[in-house]
Amino acid sequence: MARYTGPVCRLCRREGMKLFLKGDRCYTGKCAIDRRAYAPGQHGQSRGKKPTEYGIQLREKQKVRRIYGVQEKQFRSYYDKANRQKGIVGENLLRLLERRLDNVVFQLGFATSRPEARQLVRHGHFTINGRRVDIPSFLVRVGDVVGVKEASKSSPRLKEILSSLDRTPPKWMNLDANAATGTIIALPDREDIQLPIQEHLIVEKYSR
């Protein structure tokens, strides 16, 4: 399946919540869902039919996929991996998604959105333990140090971001704003993931 390249604000309206896909714009009055808090399309404002159990499960899966920018095949791969791990499957799934390099870059404040973080990673602006990594899906481990590549610190976009770096990252990572690095000090716990996600619905969908 090809990556969605249309208006991302439609995705937020489809899911009925802010997915924070456009960075700073999402925090302003220009956000589309603040102005049109209904689904896109001709019948977006109509009530429609009551969603089925399967429909609710599908929407939850689509919402999480869109938050993290993961395609269906890869998302299923994450689920299968989570299912093989010890512990609660849904929490395992979210933990894998949180460990993606593009998400870590976003959480550290080196990008204003996950899509921007994904693009910056692909362009080779980040290192892990001093080595350049340009794979957004790379899974970080405890002890990894994620940093902005030295040569990239002078690029206009990253220079702008680093000059106003004020994000407080989750407790499973430490940020050194002066060095433009972040250290993974633990794996994320469920309470660290402050997103309105009902992961049990995703597990139920794939268990059908």
From Swiss-Prot:
Q: Which GO terms describe its biological process?
A: ribosomal small subunit biogenesis; translation
Q: What are the annotated disulfide bridges? A: none
Which terms in the GO cellular component ontology are assigned?
small ribosomal subunit
Keywords, A to Z? Ribonucleoprotein, Ribosomal protein, RNA-binding, rRNA-binding
| Pfam families found in the cross-reference section | Ribosomal_S4, S4
Domain S4 RNA-binding positions: 99-165
Family membership noted in the UniProt record: Belongs to the universal ribosomal protein uS4 family.
Q: Explain the purpose of this protein.
A: One of the primary rRNA binding proteins, it binds directly to 16S rRNA where it nucleates assembly of the body of the 30S subunit.
Self-association and partners: Part of the 30S ribosomal subunit. Contacts protein S5. The interaction surface between S4 and S5 is involved in control of translational fidelity.
- HAMAP family attached here? Ribosomal_uS4_B (MF_01306_B)
Give the protein name, as stated in the record. Answer: Small ribosomal subunit protein uS4
